[in-house]
């Protein structure tokens, strides 16, 4: 299986380290470097050769572009191409060398509704090629040496004494007989394009150890050198805080009858097309109590009430937390399912790689609901989400927060759960459903956090809110009026002074994500001021376009995720949102989008340089 991405820790730490172990390694030292370029719609219009492309299917047009742009390059088509609900054909290619993948060298092409190329992203390697196929002489370390090298270099709690190797394909093996990982580790021989412009032959060792699901690129010539590490974890009736209430301070719980949307969950939330369930389990998610933090979720406790009445007592004053576990699991199940349904309406459907057991013949890969662990015992004061490629379940862990007395349960802070679920959204869309490794550079990883905050904030907007309304992230669960971010989200520069060049002094993804969400908050209010705000729980579409500013912003940001290149920077992600608007509305909101970004230093003159961004 391809690696996942555990992202989504809403509470920042001083470093991104391997969770829960003394002497843990700082994974920031192994982040993937930014290598992508992005040719926007405006740039594509300036290329006469593109306009003369022969007409064909969107796959043929995309393939022809790669052949012309990167002549004599070896590449393969990734099998996750699809046409999104906005009419854009998304096609991705992986560069190969001697038949071996270059794992961080991708080319994504976006073909518009008119059959012409809208934009493309490119991180193909253009340096010197290895003279010979390494498979001929096999002059590289064996995979077991690579696994042991990764274990030692990253201080992993995986034991391999007595383990053996089983071949899965020509370039991939599985390790049987290990202990300490939640599933059998694997290793795949691949190249990695390095920051210095050279190419390294590596073993990509995949280890799922719970709070971290790692893809570690061990040098295939020396077993003590790790080049990069990708972490997939960036950590009836229902009585619940209904959608739009961010936490228990914003309202009371209601009893909702059949709260699912049959257009987006036609099997309901309590069935998968084969079985009708009476517990918190269905096509989109499976939720349970997980006090030991383990991986055996199937047999864990989950509420299964008579007559499907998921109605349980809860108040924030109850203690200890396990006394209200039924209410906690129910709330987590509800919020995550509403996320599924709303994101489906906005374009995160089966073809785009969403999370469902049964895709009902609508495309994509099934068997991948979200595993929802309430009151997970593997940590406190946090939450995380692991996003493997399409076809493998996502995994969310919601923890108890100990900053208040009595402790508070993350399941009841919708902003935290929406933030986590959005990690699944952004990791499946950026780079395509088959590649969950495209938000691992520092700036792209920061945007992953920012998108989570953006959707959580947009959802909680109230009818009387204006552009003068400020919001903090994580205030209730952290028992802090300031929340867990540097500044509130605000359009007032005196309340939140963050601009693009602020990133020059930031080296942590949650901090960088705060800058990104601040920019999106500006765009959000520009669009609301132009188009109004729909305060209902679902968007209203006219010719495929949300007819209000709030849902339009959410739609354009989501479309931009699928358009942008792998591991984008802020400038490229901004351009992808502009291109999304060009495709959806013919650029009707170009000025509002530009003004929002420009106010925060990401205008026309903004330049990305990891050490000296300018704006």
From Swiss-Prot:
PROSITE patterns: ZINC_PROTEASE. The keyword rRNA processing does not apply. It comes from Trichophyton equinum. It is found in: Secreted. This is Extracellular metalloproteinase 1. GO terms for molecular function: metalloendopeptidase activity; zinc ion binding. One of its GO terms (cellular component) is extracellular region. The lineage of its organism: Eukaryota, Fungi, Dikarya, Ascomycota, Pezizomycotina. Its cofactor is Zn(2+). Binds 1 zinc ion per subunit. Belongs to the peptidase M36 family. Zn(2+) binds at residues 419, 423. Gene3D superfamilies: 3.10.170.10, Neutral Protease Domain 2. Residues 9-235 form a propeptide. Residues 1-8 form the signal peptide. Glycans are attached at residues 276, 464, 583, 612. GO terms for biological process: proteolysis. Keywords: Glycoprotein, Hydrolase, Metal-binding, Metalloprotease, Protease, Secreted, Signal, Virulence, Zinc, Zymogen. Pfam families: FTP, Peptidase_M36. Its EC number is 3.4.24.-. Secreted metalloproteinase probably acting as a virulence factor. The active site is at 420.
């Amino acid at each position: 299986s391809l690696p996942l991405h555990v992202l989504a820790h809403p509470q920042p730490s001083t470093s991104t380290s391997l969770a829960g172990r003394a002497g843990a390694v700082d994974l920031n030292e192994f982040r993937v470097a930014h290598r992508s370029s992005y040719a926007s719609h405006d740039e594509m219009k300036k290329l006469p050769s593109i306009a003369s492309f022969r007409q064909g299917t969107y796959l043929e047009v995309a393939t022809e572009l790669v052949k012309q742009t990167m002549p004599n390059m070896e590449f393969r088509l990734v099998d996750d191409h699809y046409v999104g609900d906005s009419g854009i054909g998304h096609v991705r290619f992986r560069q190969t060398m001697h038949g071996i993948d270059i794992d961080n060298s991708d080319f994504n092409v976006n073909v518009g509704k008119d059959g012409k190329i809208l934009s493309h992203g490119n991180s193909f390697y253009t340096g010197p090629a290895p003279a010979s196929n390494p498979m001929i002489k096999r002059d590289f370390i064996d995979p077991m040496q690579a696994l042991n090298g990764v274990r030692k270099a990253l201080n992993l709690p995986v034991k391999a004494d007595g383990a053996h190797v089983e071949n899965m394909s020509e370039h991939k093996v599985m390790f049987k007989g290990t202990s300490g990982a939640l599933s059998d580790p694997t290793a795949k021989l691949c190249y990695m394009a390095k920051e210095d412009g050279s190419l390294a032959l590596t073993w990509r060792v995949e280890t799922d150890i719970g709070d971290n699901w790692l893809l570690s690129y061990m040098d295939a010539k020396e077993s003590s050198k790790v080049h990069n590490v990708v972490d997939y974890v960036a950590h009836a009736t229902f009585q619940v805080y209904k959608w739009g209430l961010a936490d228990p301070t914003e309202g009371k719980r209601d009893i909702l009858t059949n709260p699912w949307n049959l257009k987006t969950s036609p099997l309901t939330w309590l069935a998968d097309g084969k079985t009708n369930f009476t517990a918190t389990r269905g096509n989109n998610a499976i939720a349970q109590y997980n006090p030991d933090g383990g991986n055996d979720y199937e047999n864990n406790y989950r509420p299964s009430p008579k007559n499907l009445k998921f109605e349980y007592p809860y108040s924030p004053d109850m203690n200890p937390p396990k006394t209200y576990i039924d209410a906690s699991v129910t709330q987590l199940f509800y919020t995550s399912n509403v996320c599924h349904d709303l994101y489906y309406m906005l374009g995160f459907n089966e073809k785009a790689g969403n999370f469902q057991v049964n895709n009902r013949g609508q495309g994509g890969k099934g068997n991948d609901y979200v595993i929802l662990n309430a009151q997970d015992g593997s940590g406190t004061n946090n939450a995380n989400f692991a996003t493997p490629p399409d076809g493998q379940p996502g995994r969310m862990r919601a923890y108890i927060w100990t900053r208040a007395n009595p402790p508070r349960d993350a399941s009841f802070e919708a902003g935290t759960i929406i933030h986590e679920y959005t990690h699944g959204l952004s990791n499946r869309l950026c780079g395509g459903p088959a590649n969950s490794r495209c938000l691992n550079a520092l700036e792209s990883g920061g945007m992953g956090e920012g998108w989570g905050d953006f959707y959580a904030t947009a959802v909680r907007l109230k009818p009387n809110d204006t552009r003068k309304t400020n919001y903090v992230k994580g205030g209730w669960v952290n028992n802090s009026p300031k929340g867990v971010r540097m500044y509130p989200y605000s359009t007032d520069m005196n309340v939140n002074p963050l601009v693009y060049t602020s990133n020059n002094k930031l080296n942590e993804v949650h901090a960088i994500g705060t800058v990104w969400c601040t920019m999106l908050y500006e765009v959000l209010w520009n669009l609301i001021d132009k188009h109004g705000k729909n305060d209902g729980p679902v968007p209203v579409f006219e010719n495929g376009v949300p007819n209000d500013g709030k849902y339009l912003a959410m739609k354009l940001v989501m479309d931009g995720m699928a358009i942008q290149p792998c591991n984008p920077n802020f400038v490229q992600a901004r351009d992808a949102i502009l291109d999304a608007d060009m495709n959806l509305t013919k650029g009707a909101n170009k000025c509002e989008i530009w003004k929002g970004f420009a106010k925060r230093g990401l205008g026309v003159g903004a330049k990305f340089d990891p050490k000296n961004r300018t704006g």
